[in-house]
Amino acid sequence: MSLEDCYNVTQSYAAVAIHKEQTADYVEAIALFQKAKRNILMNPEFKYARERLHVMDYEDRHYVETLLCMLEQLTIRIEFLTKEIAQQEAAYKDIQNTQKSLVTQSSTGSANVAYISGNGPGDRSFIDDGNYSASSFERQNRTAPLQSKVTTASLKPNIPRTSMSSSPTASRTSLRKGAGELETHSAVKSAKKASVKSKSVLPPSKSLARTGLPAEVSTQNNANRAALLAWGSLNSSKPKHALPPSYISSEAAQASRSSFQVERHRPTPDNSAVIEAARRTYSSISSSSSPFKKKTQSHLPNRTTEVPSISKQLSKSSTSIATVAPSLASVSSVTKSPSPTPQSAPRAQSASTETAQDLDFLTPPRLSVNNPFLSDLYPASEQGLSSCEEKDSPVDGDEFFNHTNEEEIIEKQFQSTSISAMTSEKQEQILRECPDIDEELGKSILREIVVSGDEVHWDDISGLEFAKHSLKEAVVYPFLRPDLFQGLREPARGMLLFGPPGTGKTMLARAVATESRSVFFSISASSLTSKFLGESEKLVRALFTLAKKLSPSIIFVDEIDSLLSARSSDGNEHETSRRIKTEFLIQWSSLARAAASRQTADHPRVLVLAATNLPWCIDDAARRRFVRRTYIPLPDETTRRLHLNNLLKYQKHSLSLEDIEAIVKATEYYSGSDLTALAKDAAMGPLRSLGESLLFTKMESIRPINLDDFKTSIKVIRPSVNLQGLERYSEWDKEFGSQGH
């Protein structure tokens, strides 16, 4: 995985993890942050570039520095969330212990009041809050002497009763309370509520909120909810920032919706606005049909007395979070322009803005137009396979992570590091729109579409500047700006790349497909032949029909001489081969238009791009349709030097500039593929010198590649091009080529 791909995948994981953190799903957030961290640490290119940062070029060094900053921030977020989970669990345990002690104290106080008024533990009419009988009082009163050995009946004679005969409950067996008991019970409950309000309550985490609190202290539930409202964490609306549709429909997202919807708290110096918002929010939630309505109907907290006490706890918690939050913005200044810290951020801030600020430290230093993950930024007419899909307007520049199209881009990055192949539903949709072709033949042609994943860019090809310029002018620019290339400027419908084998003709075709962002049909002779009579012509018709449907598109035919060889009149040519050539030429001619009389953009745009090592074997009619015929020669000294430097860029070697010049001089008449084979064989030299000991030698102990390795390999790897054949290429180029030499 390249450094650019590693950055994009890591950013996708981090974006979803930040959403998990904002919805208080800290466990899932930690897991995704750790996955993003492993994606960086386990990347071999990052490991290699990290050790050789001082010798890297500007672009790679920029990506490595960005990944290092991301790695630091991911570690900070993991540590912060781990501590947050531990603090919330400890706070929840304190709440549970407090509730248990409150229940014990209230039941003990009720028993003492009832005992003084004449209702002793032996009287079964004593009940606290409708739940406690005499036997339950015996289990909770731990201070009673010899409680485990005596019963209620044995305790009755030993307890001094002040007015046994005058007790209103002395002679009755009913569990219903009398008038005096009701008055005493209401006093106990008011004391119990006052003690609950005086306790500080922390907002429980999302995982703990699902378990619920004991039913005996339902007022504690209301206090917890009031604390969450004052904290600014309870929100009944959905998250305002965009997320991938695949994630929104997943079980994890459904589980997060069933609990609290929590947004990250931004500390503010003034808590009065937060308290007022908590009051309004609580009143609106209590009156709506929320999942907490049934729990809060019977016991509503006193808003005038509870919310101010919670605001004190809010101010304390705000200071603790403020010490960690600025760490996100501390690195954003390294990778991007300075952004306001959380302390200077406005109070009224939406969730989408907070998400964009959280992603600042993950924003790359530069967005490359060659990034395969940015295909959603272009219009549907420029996306090839995506032209049949309905998409939003394009996004440019820094709006890449702030626009509503973020969910499509994150989903595309999170699923794979390349554009996935067309699904069967997509194929059926395209074939239904093309009823004049057979369904099975159409599927066979669609399988020839090259799926992006091993993109080739102009910088990956050494030299060949004239060929690159010709391809940009004939293919790339017209596909990217069709409004400029109209009328007489209409691009050519055919282009031929010819030259010796191994000079980069196929690489140039792949680079054209990548740079023009078009559908790329890679066709060979076997793709258009069938054992059934007449199906080969139908395959050719289906090829051009689908190319028009999915335009802008490129039909690339490698070794075109095997498909469109010169037709003979002596009868030696097979009938099937002749019919295929005729149908191909007819369908190709249907792409041409009278350009001089047209002033509008020609749709669809389809280019037939071909490569051959035998240009003199191509049929005359096919040669006429190749308007641009570009010669790809053997690399010169400058190209060979550049190619060698690219091959040795990430290798451990001890070659000096003089050594490289010596290798360049010794590799005359070597093609690009010959130089690659030579460098690979020379790289095996240090391993060959170890012999059997290479099985036990560490990587660091292997010597670098030197000049002697190349001298030895030159004796083995010889040029593959015939010198007499080069003269024939030059003659054909002078006669039919786009530029004579």
UniProtKB/Swiss-Prot annotation:
Biased composition (Polar residues): 137-155, 298-308, 346-356
Top-level taxon: Eukaryota
A biological-process GO annotation: microtubule severing
Residues binding ATP: 499-506
SUPFAM superfamilies: P-loop containing nucleoside triphosphate hydrolases
Location of this chain's protein in the cell: Cytoplasm; Nucleus
Transmembrane parts of this sequence: none
SMART domains for this protein: AAA (SM00382)
InterPro entries xrefs: AAA+_ATPase, AAA_lid_3, ATPase_AAA_core, ATPase_AAA_CS, MT-severing_AAA_ATPase, P-loop_NTPase, Spast_Vps4_C
Matching CDD domains: RecA-like_VPS4-like (cd19509)
GO molecular function: ATP binding; ATP hydrolysis activity; microtubule severing ATPase activity
Residue ranges of coiled coil: 64-103
Low complexity compositional bias, start-end: 161-173, 197-209, 309-318, 330-344
Region (Disordered): 137-214, 280-318, 330-364
Pfam families: AAA, AAA_lid_3, Vps4_C
Keyword set, alphabetical order: ATP-binding, Coiled coil, Cytoplasm, Nucleotide-binding, Nucleus
Keyword Secreted tagged: no
Cellular component GO terms held in the UniProt record: cytoplasm; nucleus
Family, as annotated: Belongs to the AAA ATPase family.
Name of the protein described by the UniProt record: Uncharacterized AAA domain-containing protein C328.04
UniProt source species: Schizosaccharomyces pombe (strain 972 / ATCC 24843) (Fission yeast)
